C-alpha cells in the first residue's frame, strides 16, 4: 500500500525561507537573495523507500520571479531490482519528459552506466500549459498548490520561463536520488521581450531560436549558468569524479572552482521594492507607481 507521509524536515506550506534549502546538514542548496515561500510539499513511502518533494517560489510585487523544486528519494532496503528498473523508466522511458533529447529541449547532457545516472536538461517552459494543460494529464494534480496560490493571491504568472533540471543517482555513492528544478522569469533577469508565448511558437524553442539572435545569446548565457549550477549540484550530492559532466565545449572548465553566476538583477528588485514601499506609504499614487514600475522594467 502506497501512503502519503509528512516528513521530519518540518517545512510547511506557507513557510518563508532564506539563504538555503536543506534536506539534511550535508545536503543543502544555496538560494538567491530574497524571501522564498514553500508552496508545495508532497511525498510517499513504502517500507524503507521514501520520496519527498518541496517546491518554493520567489515573488515580488505579486509576480513570480523564480521557483525551485527539490526532490529526495531514499531508495534503499528491499526491492533493489524493481527500483533500478523504475529509475531507468523514470529517466529514459517517460513519454513526456526525461533525460533524453526532445524537440523542445535546448540541451541534454548525461552520464549513464549501470545504475548510475547524472543528468542536466535545459529548456524553456510554457507556464500556462504546465499549470493548466500539461502533456501528462496526471501532472495537473501535482500543480494544484501552485494554481491555488496564483488564484488566491492574484499572482501574475509569466508566459515563458527558462528552466533547468538536475538529477543524480548512483548506488556506488548512496541509495538516494536527488533532483533540483530551476525556473526563472526572464523579465526579471534582463531577458529580451518576447512576442510569442506558447511552447512551440516561443522565440526560445530550438526550432525558432536561430531566427532571434537576442534570444539565442540570452539562452546561451542561461546554459552556462545552468552548467555552473550543475557543477555545484554534483558537489553537493557527492557525485563521483568520473560521473561528472564535461562542460568544456560551452567554455566552462570543470577543474576550476565553480562560482555560480546568478541571473538575478538585485538592483532591479531593490528598486521595485523601494517603489512598492512608497506606494504603500502613500508617498506616490497608483498611477505614478505604474509608470515608474514600467520604466524600471524597461
Task: Kindly label every feature range from the protein language model.
Residues 23-24, 173, 279:
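Structural motif
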Residues 7-8, 17, 250, 272:
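Extended hydrophobic/Leu-rich segments
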Residues 259-298:
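Cys/His-rich metal-coordination motifs, chiefly Zn-binding "fingers/knuckles"
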Residues 7-8, 13, 254-262, 268:
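Sec-dependent signal peptide cleavage junction
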Residues 3-5:
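N-terminal signal peptide c-region/cleavage motif recognized by signal peptidases
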